[in-house]
């Protein structure tokens, strides 16, 4: 892996890595792997760049499927999505890629909006959701020299609010 490098690589290197991903996905399919899964993270917000334009997220979805992945886990890893943006995003994605088996949704419940984000995604047609027993989990790991370290900076929040959506809450909904 190349943690946190994506923001600093030039377009030539990006193109090389995309070709490499295409070759790897093809290799996996050719050797019996039936379902190759990718994650498109920071759809709605990025700890480094701030709010993400929805058009940019659509570009990543298109690119990921064009590489040959079978499913995307769409992720709000910053927990900043509002229900209206989630509904708009998934309505548009599912219009273009209507097979529900191609999509799942992962939310960090930083601001207590995870359940409303899941509800909005369900209303748009998403049927696979990533939940966590007891809300265990938190923010995306901060990596320094390949080692996870404690996060620092304005985008790290109160540890009491950084878990994932709890499975029992999701079932109750």
Model-derived regions: residue spans:
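Catalytic cores and adjacent flexible loops of soluble metabolic enzymes
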Residues: 1-173
